[in-house]
Amino acid sequence: MREFNALRCYPQPKEPRYVGPNIRTIKNRIAASYRDERYYDGDRNDGYGGFKYDGRWKKIVESMCKDYGLTEDSALLQVGCEKGFLLHDFNERFPSMKIRGTEISDYAIANSMPSVKPVITKCDFTELPFEDKEFDIVIAIGVVYTLTLRDAILCLKEIQRVGKGKSFVTLGAYRDERGARLFKYWTLLGATILHVDEWIEVLKEVGYTGDYNFTSAEYLNLAEITG
């Protein structure tokens, strides 16, 4: 396994994202937990604040194809594909590629990209309905750390099982007390937020062989509101 940012081409805000204890409250987290319209297309403090396709994933598709040697003959799975934006762009790049997605949100599936809606399956992230070693690449962005520790372990084991060894996951993490505090202020769905060294132990436990990247306060450019 290696630490590697397969999302390096994804646009990041240049200005800090200011967070604090009274911006995203328990009411916002309750709303987000339903993963319905409020989370995807409602108020920004409840989730995305409008989750619309804008083509920003196209650059990610190109870089991932180079990073992982993906071609039209590859098989790809995205765990937690939401509205299928990344899958859609892969489908446009390689129309004959075997593409599959899983999602737990009925709203996201109902409002997913028409081009890939037929290949999105509703299922738990801990029980993927696929054969062993079925996919050349398995992707899970913003998924694993929204689960309990037990389910995060099960999800990683499933990613390892259905893939052929190549995968990419993001993990909610911190390196110090400040980072932990800022990430807690920011996250709506984060359930397992660990120190980077603790995540390494989890990955070793499941025999993970793919790539991982830490979603942290530094990565997100979070800053604390003062005064």
Residue ranges, per PLM feature:
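Class I (Rossmann-like) S-adenosyl-L-methionine-dependent methyltransferase catalytic domain
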Residues: 1-68, 75-129, 147-154, 158, ...
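A conserved beta-strand element that flanks and buttresses the S-adenosyl-L-methionine
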Residues: 139
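Short catalytic micro-motifs in class I SAM-dependent methyltransferases
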Residues: 142-146
